[in-house]
Amino acid sequence: MTYAVQLPSEGPDDWAAWSRDLAARIRSLDDGEDVTITVPELARPHQVRKARAFGLIPARYEDVEPWVRVRRDEHHAVVEMVGSEDFGGLFFFTEPEDAALEALGWRRPGPISMEERVWNRWYPDDVTDTAYLPKDDALAAADLVTRTLRDILYSAQR
């Protein structure tokens, strides 16, 4: 089951409370379930067709809204975010935004061409022999999502 969350154009009134609620939701996921957060108001154009015939047929663009998904994969929470056009994803991030995402701990997809072209991060980061997601890892995953939305995507709007 997917839990869909659509954030308002200005973001939550209380980011800390929203992050705590997200951590609780993450810990309650059953295997294979996910929570997906979208922000339609922060959509950016993505080129889906280049100009052709010497510009007589113009390039075509579609708006792509940013999304972040946290899904449970056995004993891990896999956090994924719409990929940057820089590595073949669908969302236009500026170079400073790409650098900020890496600084937050997001990982670019590997060199395997079949791999989905999204930013990702696993919690816990290593093989685990514990039950699904300790509270600290759920809080860390929620914090990554919160800081990404608040400090990178929403701050670009201002």
Pin down the residues of each PLM region:
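Structured alpha/beta or helical-core interaction and ligand-binding surfaces enriched in interleaved
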Residues: 1-158
